Amino acid sequence: MFWKFDLHSSSHIDTLLERDEVTLKELMDEEDILQECKAQNRKLVEFLLKAECLEDLVTFITEEPPQDMDEKIRYKYPNLSCELLTSDVSQINDRLGEDESLLKRLYAFLLNDPPLNPLLASFFSKVLSILISRKPEQIVAFLKQKDDFVNLIIKHIGTSAIMDLLLRLLTCIEPPQLRQDVLNWLNEEKIIQRLVEIVHPSQDEDRHSNASQSLCEIIRLSRDQMLQVQNSSEPDPLLATLEKKEILEQLLSNIFLKEKNESAIVSAIQILLTLLETRRPAFEGHIDLCPPGVNYSAFSVNKNVLAAIQERLPSFHQLLLDPPKTGVMKTTWGILDPPVGNTRLNVIRLIASLLQTNTHSINEELIELNTMGVILDMFFKYSWNNFLHTQVEICLALILASPGDSPEHSTISEQNSTGDHVLLKHLFLKCHLIDRILEAWAMNEKRQSEGGQRYGYMGHLTRIANCIVHSIEKGPNSVLAHQLIKDLPTDAQERWETFCTSSLGETNKRNTVDLVTTRHIHSSSDDEIEFKDPGFSQDSAIQQFGFNDEKFADQDDIGNVSFDRVSDINFSLNANESANIALFEACCKERIQQFDDGGSDEEDIWEEKNIAFPQETQRRSSSGSTDSEESTDSEEEETVKQGLFESSTVNHEDKMEVDANEASNWTANFDIPMETAHVASLDSVGSDAWSTEEPLSSKETGWASFSEFTSPINTKETIRSSSPVEMETSTEPVDPLSVNASAQTEVTVAMDAVSDGDEEGENADQMTETVMNGSMKETLSLTVDAKTETAVFKSEEGKLTTSHDSACKYGVVENFDSAMENAPPTQPSSSSQEQRTSEQIVLDGASANGPV
């Protein structure tokens, strides 16, 4: 898309193409020529389509560059030429596929003597492969005209790029009929026979490897094609040719000459393994050591392959005893002379594949040769070769897990023979598998007890022993295996049973991965409810964790949550679960009860709301203030404070509205026991504190007079705050003579409204109100002259009586500061502004709080 829509920046190539004498090399020197070509620059494509330019491009990839050139730029033009020709531009592909002269020039590269230049061979193979893919009819027709094409391919098969070209010819042709024609053509050219001839000791290792890989890929591709096109009328000719008995005999005869060549033997075994390979090997990955049975795939092994291998089993067995000569190998733990070698390892892999077929005749041949005994000897001899141990383990597992001998691949004479599992009997009776396992285990324990190193095969030996136990208990041959254990000598039986219960059991327990908790949890049907799937997506919950802000918690971004499951959640909480909880709730009720109002029992006392008062209450000029730090409305505080100085006209009939039941039920109880020096009982205080009669006369010396104070606030606008007010504890020191440190205190403020300021002896309208002060140490009486608007504080000394009645809920405690006693006398109405300011400060210091 980048090249198609011309999203790249402009280059210098367009400027060069405007010149008449521009050359191909000048354009190839530009860094962005490849990008311009893929973008199908019209001028550039037209320039490259010139006959001389295409010839130069093909020449660059088919001829060796000069030797005297610098190595850094020697293959610059061949590489760019290959990339330009394979840029998948349709015009270039069409011109190459239709111009026979260019194809001949390209084909001439195969006429060079071997070995070919690997880099140029890769360029040639890449260009011809894309032509086969884009122009299959033209290229196949051209190659068929060349009689020596297959010979040249076989000649240069040692070059990997040529082998890739052969495989491309088999895979890149999509039309089924054309592909079938190519297969028939290659089969007629006897390409299979020629590849088999290469697997010969006289050829070099590269030719062995590439020829073997080519044959293996042909087998796999042919079988895959058979699966894809199941209704194909014609079988794959190349696969059918390779599975012929004479071809297989030729392959095996080439490797078993007097001169043993490891490369040729390994390459031939790779071809045989591919022929024996089913669609998916039963033990690929070796996941399950003891499968209940061997699963055969859709591909059945050709009888010709089994017959050809069976004839050469003695030769393969001899390779185990006498492999090709190899040098001495030095390892970290010792010297291997001779080492296992790649030959013997591949022979054991071949035997494992033969055991998977479970053919009776092959099993009989292996028993006669005692091949399994030789393999077991190698298992214990080479204690550190895990490749060998894995293959031996697979062989034993196949024998133990496979059913009786299958007559599927047997001849008519073999079908009349016994159907017993002869190979399993051979393992227990002739190979003495149980005895060898016990001996090796004992040797390892002895070696470890002496401080030696553990044998490297012990892990595989443990798995083999577990496989035997599994086969005896649950395997397809459990009856026969159990009988074979009983047929062992008594001593061997006892040792095996002891080994299974002690050593093997301890090893398995040690190798078992325990859970984090050591306590074994036994599941039951009741646990299903506890392990229900959550009703939300765990991934979305993790991603949304911590994003509580609205811009991160959009409903569209949250995973699909099943809200219907919320109803399934059952919360069963016991209110009396803890005594501490009940005690805490009772304490909270006691502290909040003093703020309760008869008409707002169910309201939230801490909720801020508008307060409406009856008209009768608004006529009174009473207010309370608090210095609490919890207060949030500063204007309300100022209004409450200024309310102390407002004048009001109060009738004699106006009294404090107190509910008798509420007053009697009001309780103030604190956790800390307190002792009061002066406590007034309910009987003595209740009649005086709430009465509207003229208060007792007391000495007024030491108190300020605010006769000239004028309140700027209208009396009618004054309201009485009914909201609960938090008490504030004063930081002033407590007089130890009058107030105990833990005593309950109550401040009584008496406000007297005097109607006639000239007659001091007449009875004046008064209003008294009891207010709880947070300082808990002052008892004050405030008398306000309604006419002259004079406010006088009076101390209530001697008015309160002490009561020791435990039922008393109200207490009045007097506490006077020495500073208050030394206050200046009452000033006339002509007092200065400074005096009124100081008096107002003193007045503001007295905080009056009353019950709601």
UniProtKB/Swiss-Prot annotation:
It comes from the Eukaryota. This is Serine/threonine-protein phosphatase 6 regulatory subunit 3-A. Residues 714-732 have a biased composition (Polar residues). Residues 610-653, 714-742, 817-852 are annotated as: Disordered. InterPro entries: ARM-type_fold, SAPS. The lineage of its organism: Eukaryota, Metazoa, Chordata, Craniata, Vertebrata. Coiled coil: none annotated. Residues 627-638 have a biased composition (Acidic residues). GO terms for molecular function: protein phosphatase binding; protein phosphatase regulator activity. Regulatory subunit of protein phosphatase 6 (PP6). May function as a scaffolding PP6 subunit. Belongs to the SAPS family. Residues 828-840 have a biased composition (Low complexity). It comes from Xenopus laevis. GO terms for cellular component: cytosol; nucleus. One of its GO terms (biological process) is regulation of signal transduction.
